[in-house]
Amino acid sequence: MQKTEVHSPYNNPLPMDSSWLETLQKIGARIESGVVRDFGNPTAERQATQSSAIFADLSHLAALHFSGKDAESFLQGQLSCDVKAIPQGGSSLGGYCTPKGRMLASFTLLRTQDGFVMLLSTSIAAAIQKRLAMFVLRSQVKIDMPGDGIVLIGLAGPACRDAFSESFDGTFPAGLQVFQLFGERLLLLVPLSSAPATITGICTRFVPVGSGDWQWIEIFLGIPLITAPTQDQLIPQMANMELIGGVSFKKGCYTGQEIVARTQNLGKVKRRMYRAHLEVEASPGDELFSDDLGAQVSGLVVNAQPAPGGGCDLLAVAQVGSHDSSTVHLKTPDGPALKFIPLPYDIT
C-alpha cells in the first residue's frame, strides 16, 4: 500500500498511509510535520475543546505492541504502573524509568485483545522499543510497532461515550477497539480498512480538531508527555505521575522502583509539575528561572500548546518553594513570568 512520507515533531520521520491521509484531507485536515495541524479554523477548534465533543487524529503518538504469553509479566517488571490491574479494554498512565528513577518515557498503556499497546511520543518511540527489547532475554515477548495497519483517534468532551455510541447507532466498524482514558476520554484503535467508516460515524457527533488541541486537553488535565527534550530529567513524582494513576507502590519491583519508592516514603518532593499560562510561545525542555534562585535553573517546560483564549498553556516542573512564594520566568531570570493555573487534582 502506498505511503506518503511525513515528519513527526523533533524530525522523526513516520509513514502516514496515503489512504488515511486522504480520509483526513476529505474532511478538511491540514497536515504539517506529520500531524494534523487543524481542520481549517484553528481558533474555533481550540474553543471547541472547552465545551464540545471533539475528536483528533493522534499521529503525534506512536504505538508499541507487546504480545506473547510473558508480555504482562515482562511489562510489570519494567514499568511504574500496575500492568496486572489493567482490565480488558482499559488503560493506565505510566512511566518507564532508568535505574536512577528518571523517566525515559511517559505513556498510556492499553490492554488489547492480543496483548498490550503503549502509546508514547513519536520522538522517543524507536529508542524505547530498542531499549525494552534488550531486556526481553528468554521471555516470550514480541515488541513491534504496528503503525502500518492501525490509526489512533482520540475522543473527548461532554458525554463522550454516549456521543460515541450514538455515532454508530450500536453497530461499530469491523475491528474497532475502544479504550477508556484518564479524564473522561476515549481512545479508538482502528484498523486502516475501517478508518473511513469510523470517521464518517464520529463526524456526526464530534468536532474534528488538530493534534495540538488534543495535547492542550492533556495539559488541561495535567497529563505529562515526555518527549526527546525532557527524557531522563524527571522522576515520576516531579511530573505528578503518582497523582494520576501512573505509579503503583504495591506492585513490587520494576526498573527505578527503589528511587521512586524512597522519594515517596521520605515525603520530600522538591519539584512538582504545575499548569501555567504565558503570552509568548514555549517549548518542551525550555529552562525556567525564579526570583528566589537567581541564575540557578528552577525547572523546565514539559509540554506547551496554544491556549483557546490566546497565548500559550503549559505544564512546567518547578521548585515547590518557587511556585509558592516567588515568580517563575521562562528561559532567563528576567524572562516572561508564568501565571500559574490550578490543576484538576490536588498536589499539596
Walk through the language-model features, giving the residues of each:
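Hydrophobic/aromatic-enriched cytosolic interaction surfaces used to assemble or bind macromolecules
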Residues: 12-14, 38, 114, 174-175, ...
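Acidic, low-complexity central loop/insert segments
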Residues: 54-55, 63, 86, 105-221
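Short glycine-/aliphatic-rich beta-strand segments at the starts of folded cytosolic domains
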Residues: 56-77, 144-160, 268-279
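Acidic, proline/glycine-enriched N-terminal capping motif
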Residues: 2-93, 97-98, 102-104
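Short amphipathic beta-strand starts and helix->beta connectors
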Residues: 42-51, 90-106, 136-139, 168-176, ...
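Intrinsic-disorder/low-complexity, polar/charged segments enriched in Ser/Thr/Lys/Arg/Asp/Glu/Gln
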Residues: 61, 115, 185, 258, ...
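Anionic-ligand-binding alpha/beta catalytic cores of soluble enzymes and soluble regulatory domains
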Residues: 189-277
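Glycine-rich, small/acidic residue-mixed loop/short-helix segments
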Residues: 10-12, 239-247, 261-348
